[in-house]
Amino acid sequence: MAKEATRVRRRERKNISSGVAHVNSTFNNTMITITDAQGNAIAWSSAGAKGFKGSRKSTPFAAQIAAEDCAKKAQEHGMKSLEVEVCGPGSGRESALRALQAAGFMITSIRDVTPIPHNGCRPRKKRRV
């Protein structure tokens, strides 16, 4: 009995003009997700998904490449304007934002949504290099 061939389903073009770019920049990686106004993901990318490994994932250049890739995917769905939500303490925050702007998006607002504790959990120790 022959196994049925799995078909690769191509995603249809969504024609969404505005959305939200969530830039999550940690100490180890930078992840960019572009969603519509309801929060449904349109496109995503990360430094690790673009082939950077180890400590190179946390560089601003890796964040820039990931943001350019995510922007290209979102523009295929007709996206033109973005609100940007930046989260996290990593080094890829500004470079990802600059890459989204250079890709041709009109950025309407930039928000920092990094969670700040009101003296919650004990933070990890500071690195001594």
From Swiss-Prot:
Gene3D superfamilies: Ribosomal protein S11. Coiled coil: none annotated. InterPro entries: Ribosomal_uS11, Ribosomal_uS11_bac-type, Ribosomal_uS11_CS, Ribosomal_uS11_sf. GO terms for molecular function: rRNA binding; structural constituent of ribosome. Part of the 30S ribosomal subunit. Interacts with proteins S7 and S18. Binds to IF-3. PANTHER family: 40S RIBOSOMAL PROTEIN S14/30S RIBOSOMAL PROTEIN S11. This is Small ribosomal subunit protein uS11.
